[in-house]
């Protein structure tokens, strides 16, 4: 007898669906990538930004090949829906990262959307842009579970040492 149950199996999918189908996904990524090249910083849901990051990095790699490379021009023409951004890719963004191998983008999580669907949101930007820098999130290490437990342990130890050794009052 064979038992089976429904499980969340990806069946070879290595990317997020992000929409109604493969064509919708490509159009969404093209629009996001065009916005990123134009503004050098965009805000979207975490899933979209995370999926976009690889394409943004690869587009810069193609841009570094130069505008005389036929494959680089075809990729730029395909992914950028606004054709006035192709010179920006080859003349502004690619020279900025000429001596760098990868790591052209930065992703930061921002607070979730309040009024709509509470989606996890993020910002993606090209490093070295002229926009004011985003504040990097700093976690308060005093609030982590481990530090809370250690603080409680120290307080318990101090309380037990005080109770076992009462303070001696000087006699006059």
Swiss-Prot record:
Keywords: Mitochondrion, Ribonucleoprotein, Ribosomal protein, Transit peptide
GO CC term, one of those recorded: mitochondrial inner membrane
Keyword Ribosomal protein found: yes
GO BP field: translation
Compartments it resides in: Mitochondrion
Gene Ontology molecular function terms on file: structural constituent of ribosome
Primary residence: mitochondrion
Superkingdom, natural source: Eukaryota
Record-linked NCBIfam families: L17
Family to which the UniProt record says this protein belongs: Belongs to the bacterial ribosomal protein bL17 family.
Subunit structure: Component of the mitochondrial ribosome large subunit (39S) which comprises a 16S rRNA and about 50 distinct proteins.
Name of the protein this chain belongs to: Large ribosomal subunit protein bL17m
Organism this protein belongs to: Bos taurus
Organism phylogeny: Eukaryota, Metazoa, Chordata, Craniata, Vertebrata
The gene coding this protein: MRPL17
